[in-house]
Amino acid sequence: LHLPRRHRLSCARSHTGNAAEEIVMPVNRQFVLDSRPTGNVSPSNFRLVETPAPAPGAGQALVRHLYLSLDPYMRGRLNDSKSYAKPQEVGAVMGGGTVGEIVASNNPRFKPGDKVVGMGGWQDYALSDGRDLHVIDVTRIPIQAYLGPVGMPGVTAWYGLNKIIAPKAGETIVVSAATGAVGSVVGQLAKIAGAKTVGIAGGAEKCAYARAELGYDSCVDHKSPDFVAELKAALPEGVDGLFENVGGIPFATCMSRLNNFARVAVCGLIASYEGAPTALDNVGTLLITRSKIEGFIVGDHLALWPRALNELAGHIAKKRIRYRETIAEGLEKTPEAFIDMLKGRNFGKQLVKVV
């Protein structure tokens, strides 16, 4: 493998009767979970280690990562508690979505140079038997988009909107975290369906972007001291569909404005990931309005991924869906970028450019 010097380490190999021979091998930098956070995540919860990049065995391929995906669900996996996903093991490489390039392969499905999307985690290189890898076409769509609007976040948006909310033309759809990787796609798909869209985002800049670039009819700043009153004022006709990514006060306020037979898709509750959850004190609204509320995990619906990805790719190629990225430069910035994302400091999809 031909790599920059900063990605190399040396070791010695001896042969009988010959002098020691130096072999140059690539270094695999890895972030492992060093300790579980109590409260807010800290950089000290992660540890950077360096090991030789592994050689692929029978049926395996070696991937050099180009971009890492950072997503809110990762916070829940840091806790040693029951959830829909297995807790991240202490001492193990942090898991997560990746896009990269095949650099060596003993698997007939992949050849060196192939661009792939997978779940290689927070490291320079990863071995795979191919079950979690998919070759991607980067001629029409940028490679990092396969971690965003044409990846897990995009499919999450597609499923929650189409299969749970099922918007009708003229209905009012509310999206919290409206400019995030998932929310930004939800809002644009809802507009394509003919709905009126109301976004909730953090800060005047994000709300301006939601209206001007993502096409939201209105956007309410959850950092405003008058947020509750402003959100209610933005919903004079009530809420027909709610795509919930945040929880807390925004969720409770929207619940109080549900119309009859409204549909609520609960995708995430990031407001409670690092603290005590906010109690929902108006669940009676669900009965009064005969509304439906459904939590979902997009990984439960793999059979629908090809259809969703095909539709999303078409929208991206025709520029019907716009997206924005925050990219941290260098693997070493991963913990800091992860923490910034949890605090809402990112704009759009949070990525790490590895090389």
Protein language model features and the residues they cover:
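Short, Lys/Arg-enriched N-terminal segments with co-localized hydrophobic residues
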Residues: 2-24
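C-terminal hydrophobic helical "lid"/dimerization subdomain
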Residues: 26, 302-355
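Glycine-rich beta-strand-centered segment in the early N-terminal region that forms part
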Residues: 52-70, 78-122
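NAD(P)H dinucleotide-binding glycine-rich loop of Rossmann-like/cofactor-binding domains
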Residues: 94-101, 111-177
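Short, glycine/polar-rich helix-capping loops at beta-to-alpha or helix-loop-helix junctions
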Residues: 123-124, 202-210, 227, 277-283
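Mid-domain Rossmann-like dinucleotide-binding core that forms the NAD(H)/NADP(H) cofactor-binding site
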Residues: 147-225
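Short amphipathic alpha-helix with an adjacent loop that forms part of the alpha/beta core around
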Residues: 227-236
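Glycine-rich phosphate-binding loop and adjacent beta-alpha segment
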Residues: 249-321, 354-355
